Amino acid sequence: KRRRTSEAWSRVRAMREGAFRRRAERAALPSTDYEEKTLAKEHAEIGVFGGSGFYSLIENAREVWIETPYGMPSDKIALGEIAGRKVAFLPRHGKDHRFPPQVINYRANAWAMKELGVERIIGPTACGSLKASVKPGDMVVADQIVDRTTGRKDTFYDGPITTHVSFADPYCAQLRPIAIKALRDEGITTHEIGTIVVIQGPRFSTRAESKWFASLGWEVINMTNYPESYLARELEMCYVNISLITDYDVGLEEENGIEPVSHAAVMKIFASNNERVKNGIYRIIENTPKERTCACGSALAGAQG
């Protein structure tokens, strides 16, 4: 099974490299640019998408640009070590937060990680809560996702290969319990079940939308986890989400003591919990075994035809 999926990935990669070279030729660029910039002798086991505050976790960090057939990722990728493991870190919004959620080049970000040899991705996100019991400062290790975005480039398979990848269980079955234990060991109130609904942004929800999401039993709302998590699956990388709750969404305002959502309030909660999130990620990386026992690495098996 692993051999078949490896062959499928090789075919896709060859197809994309060929497309890149053809575009380079049309632009009168040397065809070696792709190999020099993306197939460098850099390597990482684990990738992290997050905010710029996570740079301090990485030891012996160096930064590299990785060019992809889908354009450039959000920023340079920082390579180094965390807990003795080779790690690649990429700020999904760019260092200066210049890319709002609806324009992030999610495909380039995911592809760059794959080119570096990354097999597992940790995706911390700042999120709003749709339930009073899920409080600001808590963390949710999501187990399901609902996509409410529009127009995002959310697949590597626009043709000619028809591919239908299972996304029934969006997050890695091996990484989720590791993340839950790591966060709880850090003393963080952690919810091990949660559905995250991803909205287009950059605006927050209307009151009607928020109440609708909450009425469906969903716990968390965010703007970036899709298609980031799904693209990792298409590239057969494991993905785990860590949702830091920064505020209650607007639909909960009528409940006692709950204030309206604002960007300033979100950033205040995020800043006050940044060290806890970083410590939790360190523990996750430290406790992640090298061998994968999940199905993420064979996601393409039976998906193409």
PLM region spans:
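Short, low-complexity intrinsically disordered segments enriched in A/P/G/S/L with frequent Arg
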Residues: 3, 22, 26-32
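Metabolite-binding pocket within alpha/beta catalytic cores that recognizes anionic/polar moieties
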Residues: 39-168
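Non-catalytic positions within long, well-ordered alpha-helices that form the structural scaffold/packing
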Residues: 114-117, 214, 233
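Zn-dependent metallopeptidase/amidohydrolase metal-coordination segment
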Residues: 223-263
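His/Asp/Glu-rich mid-to-C-terminal helical/loop segments that flank catalytic regions of hydrolases
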Residues: 250-303
